[in-house]
Amino acid sequence: MSIEIQWIGIGAAFLVGAIGGALVRRKVAATQLAEAKRMADQILSEATKEADILRKEAEIQKKDALLEAKTAWEQEAREMRRELQAQEKRLVQREENLDRKVAQVDARDEEFGQREKRLSQQESRIRSWEKEADALVRQQRERLEELAGLGAEEAKAQLMEQMESEARHECAKKIKQIEDEAKEAADKKAQEILALAVQRYAGDFVAESAVSVVPLPNDEMKGRIIGREGRNIRAIEAATGIDLIIDDTPEAVIISGFNPVRREVARLALERLIGDGRIHPSRIEEAVNKATQDVDNAIREAGEQATFDVGVHGIHPEIIKLIGRLRYRTSYGQNVLQHSIEVAFLCGIMAAELGINVKQAKRAGLLHDIGKAVDHEVEGSHAVIGANLARKYGESAKIVHALAAHHEDEKPSTVLAVLVQAADALSGARPGARREMLETYVKRLQDLERIGTSFAGVTNCYAIQAGREIRVMVSSEEVSDVQSHTLAKQIARQIEEEMAYPGQIKINVIRETRAVEFAK
């Protein structure tokens, strides 16, 4: 019994414990539930707030996007409106242009219609005229056939011949008119070009004198120079080959001659005769010989001075003499020695710029015209003559080629030859450096002397009186008195064949025989 009571007590205790535990758990669960509900409410409240915030932000973003889209749409709409307005303006302009063109086309159509109408009327009149003309032609043809007794074909042939003759005549007149007009236009254009060239040309004009003046102590000396019956003046002219002009010029005698060497010899000889006072043929011959020696010395000194000025050394003495003779030569009014020195310096300057041998360039420039120092008895161009002389006196092959090629007698194959060509052209083309008139005059006198000396038996020939007379000195042993007349005619004939000159030229053949004996 007691055991049962114990088990009941235990069971009751377990039951009470279980009920108490259940109540405790329930209370704890209720507390937890309340806490969970509170937390759920708090989370829900926070979520609601965040949702509201997100909704508001979304609405704000939506409004911003709508605003941006609206702004972009409005901008695009404005641009589209502007483009549409521009297109509309262009369309309006195009429409106006089309309207104008349509109006023009309509006007042209109307004008063409009127023209076509006028042309139709004219065509009708022309056809009518053609019919009338055909009828008149038939009538005239029939009448002509009756009057002339010619058939249609014969009349047609004569008419064709007449028309052809008239056409040829008209064509010739037209050609002549065209030629005259072309010539007139060419002359006018040439005058314009020449006038323009003269206006633009500003060079100096320096003439090389062909006369020398010898002062006299008094006018009485003129009579002594002339001598009895003119024997002294004839002796001077015969010995020197120049003209002595004794006129009213007070206390002066003019020496005229195109050869500067002979003119200088005559000047020195005349000054020596005037200073000595003894003037007669034998004394004249001595003075001329002494003056010739003095001029030869001056020529040598001029050549040496030129080589010294240019800075060129080791030149053969004969070439130095040729260089000195250039002092008494001119080319188109330009002194050839000064021209050669100028060419030498120009060659040196250009050679220095190109980096080639300056000394060699100066040497070629100085020697390029030595062929002009040789008298006209030597045939050939001065470039070839100069090259042959340079080769003869030991100049190098480059120098020889430069001399021969500076006037295209040989094709330039070296830089040095081209340099000499360029320097020669620069010096000669300088405004005022050269003049054509004197050179042409001198060339004519040289040709006269060349023709005179080309005949056998001639010892000397001098062109005097400005080329209106040549004096031919012949050897008395080779040419007789009778042959001298024939020689004069032969010289005159050759001058007529080879030269063009105004007026006439006197050929004076002089044959002199001297007999000399000494009394002891």
From Swiss-Prot:
<keyword id="KW-0812">Transmembrane</keyword>
<dbReference type="GO" id="GO:0005886">
    <property type="term" value="C:plasma membrane"/>
</dbReference>
<comment type="similarity">
    <text>Belongs to the RNase Y family.</text>
</comment>
<dbReference type="InterPro" id="IPR004087">
    <property type="entry name" value="KH_dom"/>
</dbReference>
<protein>
    <recommendedName>
        <fullName>Ribonuclease Y</fullName>
        <ecNumber>3.1.-.-</ecNumber>
    </recommendedName>
</protein>
<keyword id="KW-0378">Hydrolase</keyword>
<keyword id="KW-0694">RNA-binding</keyword>
<feature type="transmembrane region" description="Helical">
    <location>
        <begin position="3"/>
        <end position="23"/>
    </location>
</feature>
<dbReference type="Pfam" id="PF00013">
    <property type="entry name" value="KH_1"/>
</dbReference>
<dbReference type="InterPro" id="IPR017705">
    <property type="entry name" value="Ribonuclease_Y"/>
</dbReference>
<dbReference type="Pfam" id="PF12072">
    <property type="entry name" value="RNase_Y_N"/>
</dbReference>
<keyword id="KW-1133">Transmembrane helix</keyword>
<dbReference type="InterPro" id="IPR006674">
    <property type="entry name" value="HD_domain"/>
</dbReference>
<dbReference type="InterPro" id="IPR003607">
    <property type="entry name" value="HD/PDEase_dom"/>
</dbReference>
<feature type="domain" description="HD">
    <location>
        <begin position="336"/>
        <end position="429"/>
    </location>
</feature>
<dbReference type="InterPro" id="IPR006675">
    <property type="entry name" value="HDIG_dom"/>
</dbReference>
<comment type="function">
    <text>Endoribonuclease that initiates mRNA decay.</text>
</comment>
<dbReference type="InterPro" id="IPR036612">
    <property type="entry name" value="KH_dom_type_1_sf"/>
</dbReference>
<dbReference type="GO" id="GO:0003723">
    <property type="term" value="F:RNA binding"/>
</dbReference>
<feature type="domain" description="KH">
    <location>
        <begin position="210"/>
        <end position="273"/>
    </location>
</feature>
<dbReference type="GO" id="GO:0006402">
    <property type="term" value="P:mRNA catabolic process"/>
</dbReference>
<dbReference type="InterPro" id="IPR022711">
    <property type="entry name" value="RNase_Y_N"/>
</dbReference>
<dbReference type="GO" id="GO:0004521">
    <property type="term" value="F:RNA endonuclease activity"/>
</dbReference>
<keyword id="KW-0540">Nuclease</keyword>
<dbReference type="Pfam" id="PF01966">
    <property type="entry name" value="HD"/>
</dbReference>
<dbReference type="InterPro" id="IPR004088">
    <property type="entry name" value="KH_dom_type_1"/>
</dbReference>
<keyword id="KW-1003">Cell membrane</keyword>
<keyword id="KW-0255">Endonuclease</keyword>
<keyword id="KW-0472">Membrane</keyword>
